[in-house]
Amino acid sequence: MASGREIKSKIKSVQNTRKVTRALEMVSASKIRKAQEQMKISRPYAQAMKQMTGHLAQANTDYLHPFLIAHKQVKRIGYIVISSDRGLAGGLNNNLFRKMLGEMRQWQDKGAEVDIVTIGQKASVFFRRIKVNILGSVTHLGDTPRLEQLIGVIKVMLDAYTEEKLDRVYLVYNRFINTMVQKASFDQLLPLLAAKDKVAHHDWDYLYEPDAATVLEHVMRRYIESLVYQAMLENIASEHAARMVAMKAASDNANKLIGTLQLVYNKARQAAITQEISEIVGGAAAV
């Protein structure tokens, strides 16, 4: 059995770790509220862009934007993968990567190749380690990312699709359901799926200035950028929620371990006292 001093040292070490996990839990609880507010603020813009894009896609124009054209054969797939920059978030990133690998294997079994761009340090490190072809990467965006920080990697994928180097593009991220539930999501970005709304049958059209191609090019790109940005905010909220839950579990486990070590310490101390009494009694009897 370990000595009382060693056990005391272990208890102190676990108590120090518990202080860290409790602090991280409280910080994440605070940040998750801010992340949810950011999600709410950005949604009206994303919804307005979706509605406008749906109207333009169904309008009477002779011009069909490349993002609306489905390629006949699917030989190369592109993924925009969003992860966190930091760890200590439970299995959030690993669960996403595991499902991502499953999706990649399905396409590879069909003879398709895979290219990706990564947003977040964890995704960049993971996919470089397993030798996936990475077209672009952006990291260390913080808790309040700006859209202009994402435009570069998004443009890489959009240009590749326009040039027919990619046949489909998917967006991969953790969707925030609630504090306890985050879901790995795979959304098809390209080709854009036609919106099913009340304007499906109409006899109207827009007046385009300077022309339909220029307007559609601008709107389609802004729309896809808004989707990626919204997914980024969802992933940030998911990260803080997962970290808060993970740190709460770590603090609870620390409490249990401290209780167990305290019991062991008490038993060791009791055994030492009993031995000392026995030695004193034995010495007195010998005299």
From Swiss-Prot:
It is found in: Cell inner membrane. The keyword Ion transport applies. Keywords: ATP synthesis, Cell inner membrane, Cell membrane, CF(1), Hydrogen ion transport, Ion transport, Membrane, Transport. The keyword Lyase does not apply. It is a peripheral membrane protein. GO terms for biological process: proton motive force-driven plasma membrane ATP synthesis. Pfam families: ATP-synt (PF00231). GO terms for molecular function: ATP binding; proton-transporting ATP synthase activity, rotational mechanism. GO terms for cellular component: plasma membrane; proton-transporting ATP synthase complex. InterPro entries: ATP_synth_F1_ATPase_gsu, ATP_synth_F1_gsu, ATP_synth_F1_gsu_CS. Produces ATP from ADP in the presence of a proton gradient across the membrane. The gamma chain is believed to be important in regulating ATPase activity and the flow of protons through the CF(0) complex. F-type ATPases have 2 components, CF(1) - the catalytic core - and CF(0) - the membrane proton channel. CF(1) has five subunits: alpha(3), beta(3), gamma(1), delta(1), epsilon(1). CF(0) has three main subunits: a, b and c. Belongs to the ATPase gamma chain family. NCBIfam families: ATPsyn_F1gamma, PRK05621.1-1. This is ATP synthase gamma chain. It comes from Xylella fastidiosa (strain 9a5c).
